[in-house]
Amino acid sequence: MQFGVSTHLYHGARLDRDHLVEIAAHGFEAVEIYATRTHFDYHDEQAVIGVEGHLKDARLRAHAVHAPTTESYRDGVWGPSYSIAHGDESARKQAVEETAAAIRAAYRLGAPLVVLHPGTPTAQQPSAKDNRTDAFVRSVEELHAVAEPLGVRLALEVIPNRLGDAQSLVDLLEGALDLERLGLCLDTGHSNILGDVSEAVEIAGGYVIATHLHDNDGRADSHQVPFTGAIDWPTVLMAFRKIGYEGTWVFELVGTEPRLVLERAARARRRIEELLTS
């Protein structure tokens, strides 16, 4: 049983060796790298080589790369967003090109997965042209053609919008997106906003190939450490046991004091391990 941390925790800074060493120092074995160019410039070969070296120094495994969702993130301010489900063809193509670059970076880092957002969360007030099913299907097909020859799998993330609930994504995987090497990233916090987390886990079932573990109050996407919000973790983890999930467990957290967040995540890990093995 392996656990990792998303570099989303350090999203506002340029990803460096110290961040990865800090994650490893708290007992984590893996990392998911958040691909925003102001954080990790997946277009820059030297930046990719640098992170590759930092991972080796920290003895961390690159579990996944999170596809870009924004052009930049500085001082708490988000830049223009990317959506592979955008109905405007130029916007869709730009998002696909950025994601394709992140897939190639994942391959270079040895990360077997790239996590994709099916459009833009409703809370971010997407334009009327965004979150189109036909655009999303076309984009995933194009990205699958990039990822499949590299041996990289695409994980469609459960997010709070009309495309991103577990049932809608399963319907796509069993219909318009019946492609090899596709799966789901079960995000517990997003599932909690959408409804019942354990139900989402069971609906996703064997399609789950990645996780984002975080908690909230059921309304705001606050990315809290598990066991600090409203999620019923014993029931949720029982659902994961029921579907036979054996992949990496990734914490996707935020906080102004990363070291403190990691300490709390390490304690949450121990509780999760106890619940999964009891």
Where are these regions (language model features)?
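Active-site beta-loop-alpha junctions enriched in small/polar residues
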Residues: S6-Y10, Y34-T36, A67-T70, G119-P121, ...
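Active-site acidic/histidine proton-transfer and metal-coordination neighborhood
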Residues: R17, D57, R74-G183
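A structural motif
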Residues: F28, A106, A111, V208, ...
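A short acidic, helix-capping loop that chelates divalent metal ions and anchors anionic groups
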Residues: Y73, A85, T122-S127, I193-L194, ...
